[in-house]
Every structure is written in C-alpha cells, then in structure tokens.
C-alpha cells in the first residue's frame, strides 16, 4: 500500500499535476481531495523519517512536499459558495499543516497568504477551461457533481449551453444536462494526460442515453476505471430531494484494473464486485456494447408492442369506482363503458373504466346531460393546452387524444413501470373489451411467446441492465428493452417449450385467483408453486439464449445477453 501511495504522491508532485472540481459548490470535493492527499503525504514523510532518520529530509519541510494547494482549481457559478470554497480550502490547508507539524515538528509558513486554491466564480459551461486551467507538465484530474437536470426539465438556455458544449452536430434528445461536463472534459483532456470522474444521475447509464454519451467517450480512447452502481444520495441543500446517482471514473490507461461497486439496495453499503475485467456503459462487467433504439424488434420471432391510449381529458372520459354505478345507470353512457387499465390497475388489480366513444351516436350527448357535461369538459381542457396539436383535438372531445392498441382478440399487457424489487415483470392477459392506458404496452400473443419472454428472468435482467428507470423502478420501453432484446431465432421446439412453460406460470397464478399481480410477485411472499413455474420457464429461456442449464446468477444472464446482442447486430 505504501509503495502504491508513494507512486501517487510522486506523480502528483514531481509532474506538476492540477486537480480540478468543475462544479465545486462550497468546495466539499476539493476539500476532501486535498485533505486526504496531504494526510497520505504526511504519513509517507513521517515513515521516511522513521526509516532513514532526518538525513533524507530537507531542513525546510516544504521542500519535501509534493502536494500544493495552488494546484487545486474549482468553478462555482454562485458568488457565496465560491467564497466559502476559497476559505474552506485555506482552513483545510491550515489543518493539514498542523498535522504535518505534529508528525515532523515543522510545517510550511502560510502567512502572509501567497498561495491558495483558485476558485472561479463563473458558469462552468461558458468558461474556457483550457485558459482557466493552465496545462501542467504532469497530469490533470477533473471531478465533480454537475447539476442534475433531466431531458424534460432543462430550459431553452440550458439546451443552448449543452449544444455549445457538445457541438452543433450533436443530437441532444434524451441527454441529461450533466453530460455537458463530459463533453467539456473530453475537450480539455484531448491534449493532456489525466483522468476524470463525476457523480451524476443514474439515468446516463439507462435507456437510450448510454449509446449517445459513451460512444464519443470510448471513441476518444477512454475506458471506465471505476464505477459505483445506483445509490440514493440525499442532498443537504434546502428543499432538495434524494436522487439516484452513479459515480463513474475514466482513464486512458489500458493496464489499470477496473473496479466496480454495487449496492444491494439504494441506501445500502457499497460492495466491490470481484473479478471485474471490463466495465461497459451499463456498469456491467462485459463488452462495450451500446444498445441503440430500434423501431422494430431485433428478434425475428417477437411482434411489435404498442403503448395504450391517452385521453387528455381532465378526467372526463375516465370513470372511477365511485362514479361507476351512476354512469352505468345512464342508459346513454352505459353501452360505451369499458375497463380502462393503467400500470396501477394492472399490477394492483384495481378497477377503473373509461367512456370509449369511437362509435358514439352523434346524437348521444343531447340525450344525456352527464355525457354532454363530460364532453364539454374535455373540449375546454384541450382548448387551453399549450400544444397546438392538442388544441386541434378539442374538436373531437369524444375521442381519446392518443389512440394506442385496441384489439378485437385477447392480448398481453406489460406495465411501463414496475418495482425493481420484484424478481419478475408482472405481465397480464386481457380480454378484447379492455382499453389499456399509455402506461401499459400491449401486444397480440396468439401462441404465448410474448408472455413467456416478458415473464422470464432473462428479460427482466435485460430490462434492469439496459432499460430506463423511474427513480430506481424499472421502466419498460418498446424501442430499447423490447425491440433491442437479443432473442435468437426460435425453432418449433423452442416455441412449444416456451408456450408450455408460460401455461405453467398461468396455472400457478390460478391457484390463488383473488390475488393481484402485486401479491403474486411480492418479493418476500411468492407462492412456491409460482416460483417453481418461473424456474421452469427460466430453464427453457436460458437454454434458448445459449446457457447449458438454468442460469444461477444475473451476471451469467448479462454475459449471454451482451454476447447475443453483439452477434445479432454484427
């Protein structure tokens, strides 16, 4: 350990390295980095004195130091935190000098103050980093926790800053604001030796962001040196909620051992994953495969899935449990009432209905005051929308604003969001009269293959690995998780085996017909018969994917999935 640390201090000092927090706030990261490096340096100098006496040390201990405060830089947009960061760095330096004096009997004299950390009070995205941070003879280390703003929360001004950071040709759709710091760091370190790491929201390693973000990073010769998978971080700032974060560090050194840390749950302790060789963009030990959005399924045997229908109605086309009896008592509205199922209804077994008026008699509103009131409410809601396309639909208040899958045969429903705690994705069968909302995806499934695939451990592993998240919950998408699922071509034997295994799952559920899917798949309360049925399904699915037997771990499945994806997309 001492040799390793000695090497670190030597590189830091003799090569004249700079260390920079590109979003330093009040300086916490800089303070910790400087304090820890000074602590290590003091331990090494004290150890050197114990082993050799004072003969190898200078009379002025500052001549033996390699960690200097003036090689630390920070950028903070607000004046007050920037001043706090400056002061805090001086105090940390003072404390480190006291520790050095206690260990060696002397410390550098800092008064009057001649050197200190450089803290720029500036917007990091408009500051010229190469000018603000002079190129050293040694290495440059960049780190920080840039602002957490998603695709849907950034302003037009922030979008312009992102475009400037990435360049005019970069497609920014879905990219988080935080990725602007990745772009500027790539530019800064293009002609410098160094490494970098950021704390970011976990969304950058989910869904369609990894392909857009990591492609230019990997193309520039960078690889992931270390990473912490998703964990919850409670901000200490007033009014700030907990966010789900990842930490990713990058290096261009191919010989550096990759280190990956995981958390059993978002607020748990970090545990290092043993035997890691390569960390890919999804923070998995595996090849650097990037899963792109697709408009059609990669797998030849999978049909397309379609999300359901969205009313944009201020609740006027939806019938709640409390309203149901009154609506059904209206002879005009009753024929148009159909079950309306969103993700909550699908998973928890709750009931809700809608007025499906696609074939409505044009005279119907004149014969039902309640129907007329509801349709007028829909028209008024749409007329005041900011979206011109929605305002246009005020002319058709009896129709859902977005019409998704509506089937005249039974079909399968998959919730858009499901708890990460469940071992399996809760998939449902629906009769043709059911209208699914835009929070459910549907697909025709005449032979049970869709149900079998979506209900397997292989698929939920894929979803956990490359899919998006809502906080820590799993988010299903047609373009990434479904269309990108690397299911090889099925033989007739495969299809028959999957259909039989899917039927066993349904039979196990039928043993407890009153249970909701949430109850069937309660993480700590699954029925043994249902677990056994899913084990049987997994044995079939895992073998189809290339495993010699049912996989025992998520890692085994991830390795198969990425290998199959690389094979099918090569």
Predicted regions mapped to residue ranges:
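Extended charged low-complexity segments that act as oligomerization/scaffolding linkers
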Residues: 62-68, 115-118, 240
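Flexible, glycine/threonine-enriched loop-and-boundary segments that flank and lead into catalytic domains
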Residues: 1-18, 59, 107, 111-141, ...
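Signature of N6-adenine DNA methyltransferases within the class I
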Residues: 31, 38, 82, 90, ...
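Class I S-adenosyl-L-methionine
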Residues: 1-67, 77, 81, 123, ...
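Conserved SAM-binding loop
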Residues: 85
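Conserved SAM-binding motif I beta-strand of class I
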Residues: 72-75
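Non-catalytic DNA-recognition/assembly elements of restriction-modification systems
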Residues: 24, 370-378, 394, 487-570
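Polybasic, glycine- and aromatic-enriched phosphate-binding surface used to engage nucleic acids
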Residues: 179, 256, 264-500, 504, ...
């Amino acid at each position: 350990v001492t040799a390793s640390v000695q090497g670190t201090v030597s590189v830091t000092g003799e090569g004249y390295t700079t260390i920079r927090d590109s979003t330093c706030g009040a300086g916490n990261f800089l303070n910790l980095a400087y304090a820890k490096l000074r602590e290590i340096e003091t331990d090494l100098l004290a150890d050197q004195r114990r082993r050799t006496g004072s003969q190898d040390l200078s009379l002025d201990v500052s001549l033996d130091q390699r960690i200097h405060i003036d090689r630390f830089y920070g950028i903070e947009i607000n004046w007050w935190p920037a001043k706090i960061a400056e002061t805090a760095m001086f105090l940390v330096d003072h404390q480190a000098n006291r520790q050095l004096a206690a260990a060696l009997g002397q410390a550098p004299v800092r008064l009057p103050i001649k050197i200190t950390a450089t803290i720029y009070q500036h917007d990091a995205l408009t500051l010229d980093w190469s000018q603000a941070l002079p190129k050293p003879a040694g290495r440059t280390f960049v780190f920080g926790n840039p602002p957490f703003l998603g695709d849907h929360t950034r302003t037009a001004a922030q979008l312009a800053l992102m475009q400037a950071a990435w360049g005019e040709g970069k497609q920014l759709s879905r990219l988080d604001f935080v990725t602007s710091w990745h772009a500027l760091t790539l530019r800064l370190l293009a002609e410098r030796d160094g490494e970098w790491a950021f704390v970011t929201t976990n969304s950058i390693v989910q869904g369609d962001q990894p392909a857009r973000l990591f492609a230019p990073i990997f193309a520039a010769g960078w690889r992931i040196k270390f990473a912490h998978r998703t964990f919850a971080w409670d901000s200490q700032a007033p009014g700030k909620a907990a966010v789900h974060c990842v930490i990713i560090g990058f290096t261009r050194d191919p010989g550096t051992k990759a280190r990956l840390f995981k958390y059993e749950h978002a607020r748990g302790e970090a545990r290092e994953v043993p035997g890691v060789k390569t960390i890919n963009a999804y923070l998995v030990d595996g090849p650097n495969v990037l899963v792109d959005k697709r408009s059609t399924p990669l797998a030849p045997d999978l049909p397309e899935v379609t999300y359901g229908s969205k009313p944009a109605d201020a609740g006027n086309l939806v019938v709640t449990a409390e309203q149901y009896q009154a609506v059904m008592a209206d002879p005009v509205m009753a024929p148009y009432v159909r079950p309306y199922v969103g993700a909550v209804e699908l998973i928890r077994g709750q009931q809700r209905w809608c007025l499906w008026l696609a074939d409505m008699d044009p005279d119907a509103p004149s014969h039902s005051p309640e129907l007329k009131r509801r349709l007028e409410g829909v028209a008024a809601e749409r007329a005041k929308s900011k979206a011109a396309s929605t305002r246009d639909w005020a002319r058709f208040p009896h129709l859902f604003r977005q019409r998704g899958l509506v089937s005249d045969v039974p079909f399968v429903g998959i919730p858009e969001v499901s708890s990460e705690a469940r071992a399996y994705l809760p998939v449902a069968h629906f009769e043709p009269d059911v209208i699914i909302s835009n929070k459910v995806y549907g697909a025709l499934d005449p032979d049970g293959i869709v149900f079998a695939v979506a209900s397997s451990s292989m698929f939920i592993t894929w979803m956990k690995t490359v899919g998006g998240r809502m906080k820590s919950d799993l988010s299903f998408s047609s373009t990434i998780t479904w269309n990108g699922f690397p299911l090889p071509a099925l033989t007739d034997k495969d299809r028959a085996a999957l259909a039989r295994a899917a039927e066993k799952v349904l039979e196990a559920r039928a043993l407890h017909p009153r249970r909701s899917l949430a109850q069937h798949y309660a993480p700590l309360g699954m029925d043994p018969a249902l677990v056994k049925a899913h084990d049987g399904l997994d044995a079939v699915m895992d073998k189809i994917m290339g495993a010699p037997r049912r996989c025992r771990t998520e890692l085994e499945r991830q390795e198969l999935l990425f290998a199959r994806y690389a094979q099918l997309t090569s």
